Amino acid sequence: MEAGGGRIHAIWLPSENLKLDFTIGYDYNDEGGYPYYYTGAIDGYDKENEKYKNYIGKISYDQDCTYRRGLFNTGLNIEYQAQKFILSAVTGFQNLNDRMFMDQDFLPVSIYTIEQKQRLNTISEEITFKSKNNKRWQWVTGVSGFYQW
């Protein structure tokens, strides 16, 4: 298995009441196959005449099985503190690039294989408006949403 990744987190305070909090990260995974094995035909089938009887309980692939994933995340949190309230906006983005290839018949002959690929992008936004904590009555309101493609 090959894996790696990293993350950077930075905070900038351009003024006493404004904070910008930025995060970026990437993770990569490249794995080999999974140790599945052939269990024989389904119940009710004549197991004595099983065509692949010698492979029952054995790991016997004819193709390499792999799983690879790249995951990129980034986000920005902007927080403004006024005298009586706090305004916060959080924006996030994620990119997933994923591929799985499996020999699904679990035999040394080519009967059934599967390849699954995913490429997914997601952007999200959350805006909140809330009272300061030093008041007897506290309130919060906001809106959030996301979009995937």
Where are these regions (language model features)?
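Transmembrane beta-strands of outer-membrane beta-barrel pores
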Residues: Y26-D30, A82, F93-N97, G145-W149
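Flexible loop and strand-edge segments within Gram-negative outer membrane beta-barrel domains
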Residues: K19, I24-R69, S110, I114-Q118, ...
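Residues embedded in well-ordered secondary-structure elements
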Residues: I11, C65-Y67, I78, Q116-Q118, ...
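Outer-membrane beta-barrel translocator domains and adjoining extracellular loop/strand segments
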Residues: M1, G33-T39, M100-P108
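Transmembrane beta-barrel wall of Gram-negative outer-membrane proteins
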Residues: M1-Y34, F72-L76, N121, E125, ...
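Extended hydrophobic/aromatic segments used for targeting, binding, or gating
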Residues: M100-R136, F146-W149
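Non-catalytic interaction/regulatory modules that flank or connect domains
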Residues: R68-I114
